[in-house]
């Protein structure tokens, strides 16, 4: 199994800790005036969704978890589980809201393709594309003089609320960054 060290740590890197797969969500390289450099990281447990903070020192090594990734289609939310279907075998699996994570679920719509991560044959996590195109279902109307480059809230078809420029109208399709939860541009 491959290993990674302190210098390999960056956002999105996956590592194994105590037999559980984690994903780095934030990191900060620290070079103190005295002593060795280290990295402060926030890592998300891919099985439980829980985020912990850890300090990584120069000699620390982590194994890279053996994860299988399958592209599946999101079907629906039955209240307890989010249902996904393998489009080649038509097998269905369910993941809890905790496994998916609110930051991911906020940008999911029925029929969307998502990458499901499997660890030891068990579905553990969902990853959606970094940018998605969604329709605005509700946003306040524009008023004359709204040209100062301000922003207003817009509710998307997925239920997420993002800040959009005043010129963006209800019913328009926009491109959204799912990692930052931000408006990028009008969809072309």
Curated annotation (Swiss-Prot):
Keyword Nucleotidyltransferase: no
Keywords, alphabetical: Cytoplasm, Elongation factor, Protein biosynthesis
Predominant subcellular localization, coarse grouping: cytoplasm
GO function terms (MF aspect): translation elongation factor activity
GO biological process, one term: peptide biosynthetic process
GO cellular component: cytoplasm
Subcellular location: Cytoplasm
Keyword Cell membrane in record: no
Associated pathway: Protein biosynthesis; polypeptide chain elongation
Xref: Pfam families: EFP (PF01132), EFP_N (PF08207), Elong-fact-P_C (PF09285)
Family: Belongs to the elongation factor P family.
Function: Involved in peptide bond synthesis. Stimulates efficient translation and peptide-bond synthesis on native or reconstituted 70S ribosomes in vitro. Probably functions indirectly by altering the affinity of the ribosome for aminoacyl-tRNA, thus increasing their reactivity as acceptors for peptidyl transferase.
Name of the featured protein: Elongation factor P
Native species: Sulfurovum sp. (strain NBC37-1)
Lineage: Bacteria, Pseudomonadati, Campylobacterota, Epsilonproteobacteria, Campylobacterales
